[in-house]
A protein has these predicted regions:
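Conserved C-terminal alpha-helix-loop-beta "cap" of PLP-dependent enzymes
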Residues: 45, 49, 119-162, 170, ...
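Short, solvent-exposed loop/turn elements at beta->coil junctions and helix N-caps
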Residues: 23-26, 108-109, 147-152
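A common structural junction motif
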Residues: 56, 138-144, 181-189
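Short beta-strand segments
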Residues: 21-23, 37-39, 112-113, 119-123, ...
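Conserved glycine-rich beta-strand-loop-beta hairpin in the small C-terminal domain of fold type I
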Residues: 82-96, 108-123
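Conserved PLP phosphate-binding loop immediately N-terminal to the Schiff-base lysine helix
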Residues: 1-7
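PLP-dependent enzyme catalytic core of the Aspartate aminotransferase-like
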Residues: 14-15, 154-195
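Conserved core segment of the aminotransferase class I/II
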Residues: 10-89
Length: 195
């Protein structure tokens, strides 16, 4: 699904320097070794060109070449993304189904239903995200830290949990989601009862 041209929209609105867009191949090529890019107004690009020039002597040209050889062109990249979708879709479907069945009836949390990407963002009762994940960890389920989507991981509400279902096989993921949902309910119950 194409994104709106927000850079062009800002330019039309007379605010061309308002937005910086960033993208990375880290989740689609080599985890932790992807390449990134930035899109912005000419003035913002000129500014960052000066900043980048001071920060580094040279870009990792070997890694850039590796990506060019691997991704080749738009068609190859789209084919790769279809392969990713074939692997990821069942995992996301299962995560969302478990949340719908086990958490939605309780009414204390909400989450996005992504049409792409690699995460489900869940917002639970304020003050319970860290506790829910601590309980899950005690039960053997490791997840991304609470508040990971916030700068420095500091969620002022202690309510956001980013679910990243890409690694485990569906069967393991389903068991992990059962444990997670139980811990999420227990943390909410503790909060409601002031335990």
């Amino acid at each position: 699904m194409p994104f709106p041209d927000i850079i062009g929209m800002c330019e039309e609105a007379g605010r061309p320097d308002m937005v910086y867009e960033f993208a990375s191949t880290s989740k689609i090529t080599f985890a932790g070794g992807g390449i990134s890019c930035m899109c912005a107004s000419k003035a913002n690009i000129d500014y960052f060109t000066g900043v980048f020039g001071v920060q580094m002597i040279s870009y990792d040209k070997v890694n850039q070449l590796r990506h060019v050889l691997y991704l080749k062109d738009r068609a190859t990249t789209l084919q790769l993304m279809k392969k990713h979708a074939a692997v990821m879709a069942p995992k996301f479907r299962m995560v969302l189904d478990v949340l719908d069945q086990q958490i939605e009836p309780c009414g204390f949390a909400c989450w996005n239903k992504p049409k792409g990407g690699y995460f489900v963002s869940l917002n639970t009762m304020p003050g319970t995200a860290k506790r829910a994940l601590a309980l899950a960890a005690e039960a053997g389920v490791t997840m991304t830290d609470a508040g990971a989507t916030y700068p420095y991981g500091k969620d002022p509400q202690d309510s956001n949990i980013r679910i990243a279902p890409s690694l485990p096989p569906v069967e393991e993921l389903e068991k992990a989601m059962d444990v997670f949902c139980t811990c999420l309910k227990l943390a909410a119950l503790e909060k409601l009862l002031n335990i």
